[in-house]
Swiss-Prot record:
The lineage of its organism: Eukaryota, Fungi, Dikarya, Ascomycota, Pezizomycotina. Gene3D superfamilies: alpha/beta hydrolase. This is Pheromone-processing carboxypeptidase KEX1. The gene is KEX1. Residues 543-554, 577-587 have a biased composition (Basic and acidic residues). PROSITE patterns: CARBOXYPEPT_SER_SER.
Amino acid sequence: MLGLATTVTLESSGCSSKMCFRLLCSVSSRPARGTFVEDACWVYIISHTFFPFNMTWRVVNIFISLSMDGALMEIGPYRLQDDHTLIYNNGSWDEFANLLFVDQPVGTGFSYVSTDSYVRELGPMADQFVTFLERWFNVFPEYERDDIYIAGESYAGQYIPYIADAIVRRNEKLSANGTSWNVQGLLIGNGWISPLEQYRSYLPFSYKEGVLDKNSDGAKAAESQLSKCMSKLKEVGKFGVHVDECERVLELILDTTKVDGKCINMYDVRLEDTPDACGMNWPPDISLVTSYLRRPDVVKALNINEDKTTGWRECSPGVGRNLQATESVPSVQLLPGLLERGMPIVLFSGDKDLICNHIGTEDLIHNMTWLNATGFELSPDVWAPRHNWEFEGSAAGIYQQARNLTYVKFYNASHMVPFDFPRRSRDMLDRFLGIDITSIGGDPADSRIDGLKGAPTSVGAHPNSTTAEEKEKEKIKIAAWEAYYKSGEVALVVVAIAASLWGFFIWRSKRREKGLEYKGIYPNLESFSSASLATFRGKRRGRMDVESAPRPDEAELETLYNAAEGSDPQDGEENFSDGKGDNEKAQSHAGMGKSR
């Protein structure tokens, strides 16, 4: 599997987390099923869809993510429909990156423990993840020298810095013949990173968004509880990833919204939920994904270890009860060291999330000191400017950057930004990876920063993308039926049009592939593609059924390339895969899933 980026995406949520460590048990891209005596984790890898054949070297990135709700509801290549058919996700992160989804900590998702060996602290969690990666690279040595990016949301704000720090320490202790792992960047969305700033942000955010009336009795009760919270935080000192007295502040805010059998959704304050859930039933796809991942045929297709006796669930009570992190320092204390080592980090926030809201993220940046300056300070009393983003005529958000740290705020987005805006989030990723669409082919997106166009990006618009392929197929289908209505000669017209259009597509795409060269771009010229919130909250109509449209793999693309160069393809060179899957939502308040 060759690619331009392999990204490891980590998921977790308010009820549990998903990330794999300790024992590599089952890998969907390999047919064999592993067997281990103790705990077992589960991983899912999705290879990129585009590879420049004329490249003589491999510039490959691994993107690690915490697991299946991120894969099927956010950044993976497919989304589920109500009838359990799969449709392409126009905005998936696998176009220029290999995605590695990992159920972690052990006990989440498809991973399991055979004893009461749940992880209890963040340090051991990170060490176990390093053990997982070592075993992963033993099985897939072709990936070990790739660039690695680690991404997640919510409680992954704790996981990701700990994992990155553990990898840095592992590299420092390497023997002379060991292979250093190339962690090139971190992306954390609506992250639970600094409990102090996040707990303090609940009331200001609630007042600003109209969730709570500042003069109400509920506000007074919450303000009183916040005072108790601050006292407790002083008592625990540097240890305070989870503080019960502070959790009560959010509970009181939510209690005030329980009216007429409804409660505000803490992950998207524009929405409501049942009073016993207040957002835990969201997003609407979660019940669909759960039932899909419990189907026996899906479990078998995903190569799940037969020792796993319970069905997939988003939140693991066992993990949540045990991962209290009472002796772990909040990950915000690790960020300065990572930034000072030159590691680029992106913190991004959907502005309608309450539980890990953007005010808390902005405050933690403002109060954090790294590289001899505080916050986004460029020099004494001079601060990095906030740049306005505009995409296709609409305001998309803002970004701000200084000293290896980039902050991105997405307008009108929830706790799960890629769920709301898959194309915008993918555009952010492309900017971070340094993808320049002009060197690949495809139509650049109309993306502007402070009214000026930056380096062009495009989501799904280069000729080899799954989106472009589906558009070509749709053109063929429409043209064929128009011919049928005119003449009734269906078979002849379909063959003629399909041959001509597909031949033109191959010719055009292969001409664009000649001389491809990837140019890095400065990541602060990031932009976003548009996809409205309603796009994936509705029924997502008008997309094609992926189960009837297999995707060509690299062998097929190389066959087409050879054909375009005048060589005859050999019989049997075309291979197709019907890969299914991808995710992330901070679970039980943990990594791409719900929070904490």
